From Swiss-Prot:
This is Uncharacterized protein y4qD. It comes from the Bacteria. It comes from Sinorhizobium fredii (strain NBRC 101917 / NGR234). The lineage of its organism: Bacteria, Pseudomonadati, Pseudomonadota, Alphaproteobacteria, Hyphomicrobiales. Keywords: Plasmid. InterPro entries: Nucleotide-diphossugar_trans (IPR029044).
Length: 244
């Protein structure tokens, strides 16, 4: 496999479904502004100049393969099913063999996301090599993070029970990351191989002091998760409002 300067990794679960009164479909295939959530993200990565993107489907490809045809501005696109995915989607990304063939940035997306293009541009322009995008919104599977005054990540905590959520919640991970490939390879080598979840990923990352991780804050309307029919309706409303 040839070396590339930039790699996108999109982790999706085709079995995560959205049900409406008319039909049932994979959340990744929910349509926002005439384009599926997955296809929209892939087009944005191609437009940003990402050279290769891996779509890693947890357990099965489902119907998503049929949504990936067409030109993507020269970006190489690969699709692979993970028959035995790890508990953590970041662990799935860290163990991808393709990371060995990247010289520059690795962008990782672990949720079904409708994201503003300028967030991707900010990630690629930033001089920080390892970044996690956070927001005050409450995500479905989100871990909570703590940082110092320089927005350097200092701790990652399990999410609170919903009964303990309040308006002044900690920053929550949005499922958008930029990593130095050497950093990801170091995590893959040094993690403890116990829980195989995202918390284990971050615990290992915090122990690699040569590769600090920083937070990038995004307004909730700029990064939206789409996990159910309510999320999809909200994303379409926001898309129409921004297009007016």
């Amino acid at each position: 496999m040839r070396e590339v300067q930039s790699l996108g990794i999109v982790i999706t679960d085709p079995q995560q479904m959205i049900s409406t009164c008319k039909r049932r479909f994979s959340a990744a295939l929910g349509v926002v502004g005439g384009t599926s959530v997955l296809r929209r993200l892939l087009s944005q990565l191609a437009h940003a100049g990402v050279q290769r993107t891996m779509v890693l489907a947890r357990e099965t490809l489902g119907e998503i393969a049929g949504d990936l045809g067409g030109e993507l501005n020269g970006m190489e696109l690969c699709l692979r099913a993970l028959p035995r995915p790890n508990a953590g989607r970041l662990v799935d990304a860290a163990t991808a063999n393709e990371i060995a063939h990247v010289d520059g940035d690795v962008l990782v997306f672990t949720e079904n996301l409708v994201i503003d293009f300028d967030v991707i541009e900010r990630l690629l322009r930033s001089q920080d090599r390892n970044i996690a995008v956070v927001s005050k919104t409450q995500g479905g599977r989100s871990l909570r993070v703590l940082a110092d005054d320089a927005l350097r990540l200092t701790a990652v905590l399990p999410d609170r029970p919903s009964s303990q959520h309040h308006a002044s919640a900690d920053w929550n991970l949005m499922g958008v990351y930029k990593f130095d490939p050497a950093f990801v390879r170091a995590i893959a080598r040094n993690r403890r191989y116990r829980a195989h979840d995202d918390l284990e990923f971050f615990e290992t990352a915090l122990g690699i002091h040569a590769h600090p991780m920083h937070l990038m804050c995004a307004e909730p309307q700029r990064v939206r998760t789409v996990n159910d029919a309510v999320d999809l309706a909200a994303a379409n409303y926001a898309f129409r409002s921004s297009s007016d």
